[in-house]
Amino acid sequence: METRKYTKTRRAEQQDETRARIVEATVTLHETLGPAQTSISAIAAAAGVQRLTVYRHFPDDASLFEACTTRYLELHPPPQRVAWADIEHPSERSYAALLAFYQYYRQTESMWRAAYRDLDQVAALQVPMDRFEAYLDEVADDLGLAWRTTQAARRLLKLTLRHALRFTTWQSLKNAKLKDRQIAELVQSWLEGVES
């Protein structure tokens, strides 16, 4: 009986290890080639398994992308609100949040660039990307509430923050040769302009 229990335990461990290798291979290929250019054959080769093994663990693109996104965000978690929650002045709080996201984007640029580039081509990307965008909107709305201003100005502040927190906004300003602090300062001036 002990041998059978050991065999089942070892088999489960091997399946977990295989699954982890497939996920790691997917993360690496999505970051280097992009989701649209990553084939199941390439994932299988990088993970050292057969294509059928990939399908056994991940029967559809949605489950594979969910596992890939979960793993990537475990390794590279986006900035969390607790990092700037104690900053009282709304302009300084917004600046701290923006700078945190811009530094995060710089460190993780290759993955976000590939994901946004391939978003329209890969349906399975939509759910994880929508979830990330929803998180950005929550952060923007939370930052906007800290500003003591009129309702109309607050609406514009939130819209500005939502736009400013997007990877694509950071990317366009980075491509214009601005550093992260310069981008955060520029956006801070937009916010202060809306408030006045």
What residues fall within each predicted segment?
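Amphipathic alpha-helical packing segments from all-alpha helical-bundle domains
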Residues: L99, Q103-Y116, Q121-L159, A184-E192
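Alpha-helical DNA-contacting segments of helix-turn-helix folds
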Residues: H30, F65-Y72, L119, P128
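Basic, helix-initiating cap at the start of DNA-binding domains
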Residues: M1-L33, Q37-L52, H57, S63
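Short, basic, alpha-helical segments at the C-terminal edge of helix-turn-helix-like DNA-binding modules
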Residues: I40, T69-P77
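Hydrophobic alpha-helical connector segments
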Residues: A67, P78-Q107
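Residues in the recognition helix of alpha-helical DNA-binding motifs
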Residues: H57-F58, A67, L186
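Amphipathic C-terminal alpha-helical segment
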Residues: D142, K158-K179, E192-S196
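Short helix-capping/turn signature of helix-turn-helix
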Residues: F58, R117-Q121, A164
